[in-house]
């Protein structure tokens, strides 16, 4: 019998594996809302076929001795477990599935390190802003929807919860798997839409951006909760208006919104002004069936000086242009996913257990220089996620990223059907659900302030 193929952990996977903590599992969650129902047997078959079409996802951590030099992925021909499950329907089914996505990471020892839960006819989720209003036209007046009870949800709706162990995979790769499953299930073309083309801009003049060597601001502590782990709040907003020909993108508007939201929050909580640094994942992979499956994003850090964050309405156009120049320059840089230092840390010259201890120690020592927060903007969902006539096409898609300390807060956005889907995820050691709701309100306010003429 041929032994399974083994692949050494890439740098991102190894660093993540070194720093795992039971209290705050490294999970990514994707939540897809469909207007209709799915046939259970057909969905299981379609998802299994999608896994086979992207065989790199069929992997588990290979066992190894104490003095091994590497962690390795072991590729399998079939899943070790049934990936698709159907929780008991009920009023709390949506809330419970979201909770499981935050507290139960799929094990690395079983192939594949993901799970798909299918919640049928779920009622409103308590403790979350993912109401049953997703995909409907907004009511008149900003913020009105939030304070009104959700209407009765059709018993035919379905929510797909894909939970991913982030040590092995990232959200965009697993969204590709879902798109393939949708195409197999529904027989509809789920090819990605072409990425928007941006006009080539002349190189921006050098600017006096804050140094990455200065300690950035931390998100001020709110009202921490006693239980460990992450909290999550999701909401649906209107996409910010951006005049045609603007020199900035929606991503730049979201970056400015995130910076202003945290600056406002910190000021409310008595923190002195400090530079902010916001980590931004950049993904250059193709979105078609050739997309490499794994952790494929590289991380860049967008700095903001305290003076930039004390702006008036007249300053917003210049602030957006400056942010656009900054993000464009950072995206154009060629660099390793986690920087050059991570490559040295993961060089297999010593036993992996020794490198793990060193990595954890360096992470603790570098905590004061860790970026303030992470903004992951998936952008417009590139696939229709159309499961056919009965189940229909996705009308809302949320992602959330891990929010371990010292950051303690991540912001994830995506757009579907002309709406912006925002997820705020936080460490319970830093914030409570009430704090998350206030940050959501601040985000909505500052997003509106970015709607200006160029």
Predicted regions and their residues:
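Acidic/His-leaning functional-site neighborhoods
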Residues: 267-268, 370, 381-388
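Short, flexible loop/turn elements at secondary-structure junctions
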Residues: 164, 168, 280-284, 379
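Flexible loop/turn segments at secondary-structure boundaries
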Residues: 286-287, 382, 430-431
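Active-site proximal loops enriched in glycine and acidic residues that flank catalytic Cys/His/Asp
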Residues: 282, 377, 424-428
């Amino acid at each position: 019998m041929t032994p399974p193929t083994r692949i050494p952990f890439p740098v991102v996977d190894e660093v993540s594996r070194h720093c795992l903590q039971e209290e705050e599992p490294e999970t990514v969650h994707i939540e897809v809302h469909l207007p209709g129902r799915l046939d259970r047997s057909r969905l299981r078959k379609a998802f299994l076929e999608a896994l086979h079409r992207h065989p790199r996802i069929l992997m588990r951590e290979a066992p190894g001795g104490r003095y091994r030099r590497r962690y390795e992925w072991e590729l399998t021909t079939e899943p070790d477990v049934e990936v698709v499950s159907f929780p008991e329907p009920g009023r709390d089914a949506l809330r419970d599935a979201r909770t499981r996505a935050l507290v139960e990471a799929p094990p690395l020892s079983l192939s594949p390190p993901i799970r798909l839960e299918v919640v049928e006819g779920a009622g409103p989720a308590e403790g979350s802003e993912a109401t049953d209003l997703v995909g409907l036209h907004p009511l008149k007046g900003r913020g009105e929807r939030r304070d009104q009870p959700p209407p009765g949800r059709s018993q035919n709706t379905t929510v797909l919860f894909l939970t991913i162990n982030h040590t092995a995979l990232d959200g965009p790769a697993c969204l590709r798997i879902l798109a393939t499953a949708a195409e197999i299930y529904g027989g509809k073309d789920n090819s990605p839409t072409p990425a928007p083309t941006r006009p080539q801009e002349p190189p921006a003049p050098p600017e006096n951006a804050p140094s990455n060597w200065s300690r950035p601001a931390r998100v001020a502590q709110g009202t921490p909760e006693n239980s460990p782990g992450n909290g999550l709040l999701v909401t649906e907003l209107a996409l910010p208006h951006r005049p045609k020909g603007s020199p900035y993108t929606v991503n730049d508007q979201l970056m400015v919104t995130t910076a202003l939201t945290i600056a406002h929050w910190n000021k409310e909580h008595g923190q002195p002004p400090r530079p902010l640094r916001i980590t931004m994942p950049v993904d250059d992979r193709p979105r078609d069936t050739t997309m490499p499956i794994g952790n494929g994003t590289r991380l860049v850090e967008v700095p903001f000086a305290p003076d930039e964050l004390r702006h008036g309405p007249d300053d917003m156009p210049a602030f957006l242009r400056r942010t656009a120049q900054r993000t464009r320059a950072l995206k154009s840089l060629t660099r390793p996913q986690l920087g050059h230092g991570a490559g040295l840390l993961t060089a297999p010259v010593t036993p992996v257990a020794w490198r793990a201890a060193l990595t954890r120690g360096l992470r603790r020592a570098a905590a004061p220089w860790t970026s303030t927060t992470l903004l992951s903007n998936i952008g417009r969902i590139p696939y229709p996620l159309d499961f056919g006539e009965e189940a229909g096409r996705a009308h809302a898609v949320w992602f959330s990223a891990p929010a371990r300390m010292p950051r303690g807060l991540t912001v994830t956005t995506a757009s579907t059907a002309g709406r912006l889907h925002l997820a705020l995820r936080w460490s319970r050691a830093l914030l409570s659900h009430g704090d998350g709701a206030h940050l959501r309100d601040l985000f909505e306010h500052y997003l509106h302030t970015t709607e200006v003429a160029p």
